[in-house]
Amino acid sequence: MPLGLKPTCSVCKTTSSSMWKKGAQGEILCHHCTGRGGAGSGGAGSGAAGGTGGSGGGGFGAATFASTSATPPQSNGGGGGKQSKQEIHRRSARLRNTKYKSAPAAEKKVSTKGKGRRHIFKLKNPIKAPESVSTIITAESIFYKGVYYQIGDVVSVIDEQDGKPYYAQIRGFIQDQYCEKSAALTWLIPTLSSPRDQFDPASYIIGPEEDLPRKMEYLEFVCHAPSEYFKSRSSPFPTVPTRPEKGYIWTHVGPTPAITIKESVANHL
């Protein structure tokens, strides 16, 4: 009903009630008329019987009162039916098994097309960064802190306990995904003829190989591979060529004239 209008009971015509209800046909009933629905219907029946024995006008009035008073029980019954249905629904809701819950709804994909930078960083669904995969790159030579290292170079490692240098030869280089450079070492064992204040490659022998590489920041460059014993590419001493060296022009250096081909042939003859 519209706001501001006072309801009026369709049976007793009262305008004040603690609670108002609607009947099955839409009539407005007060709380008192709703509560006495059964008694009103009984009284209406007796009034209707008396009306039949009396005059026609009285009978018509009694029938009218009986019809009006008989409507509340129907509304009460209809309301009771609705109330019972609500109670059944509430009980079923209470007794519902909550063990098996429905699957959560799938998250909606947020499209970032046409939106600003701040919206992209304020998304509700943060994505976890993938785990870093270690990738190792091996090399035969590296450049570290202005020094060009190669396989076979000799480096020194300072011991933390006694503070003495220990020499080793580089066996290989390793670089990880963070550009951290390391080297695999082969230790060089000194002999009785090895000097204490400097490194003499002729007096050292090759020792055990390390399984784990060491970082380049702990290594100090000593010298490149000094001889074939230390895996050098060329020997510092003259060697006899194992194959003929062709394509060279031989001549004398100095004031002595070069020997001609005819003179050399005549001398051999």
Swiss-Prot record:
The keyword Signal is assigned to this record: no
Record-level Gene Ontology MF annotations: sequence-specific DNA binding; zinc ion binding
GO biological process annotation, one example: chromatin organization
InterPro entries registered for this protein in UniProt: GATAD1, Znf_GATA, Znf_NHR/GATA
Keyword field: Cardiomyopathy, Disease variant, Isopeptide bond, Metal-binding, Nucleus, Ubl conjugation, Zinc, Zinc-finger
Main location: nucleus
Expression across tissues: Ubiquitously expressed among various tissue types. Expressed in left ventricular myocytes.
Record region (Disordered): 63-115
Subunit structure comment from the entry: Component of a chromatin complex, at least composed of KDM5A, GATAD1 and EMSY.
Disease per UniProt entry: Cardiomyopathy, dilated, 2B: A disorder characterized by ventricular dilation and impaired systolic function, resulting in congestive heart failure and arrhythmia. Patients are at risk of premature death.
Protein name stated in the entry: GATA zinc finger domain-containing protein 1
Protein source organism: Homo sapiens
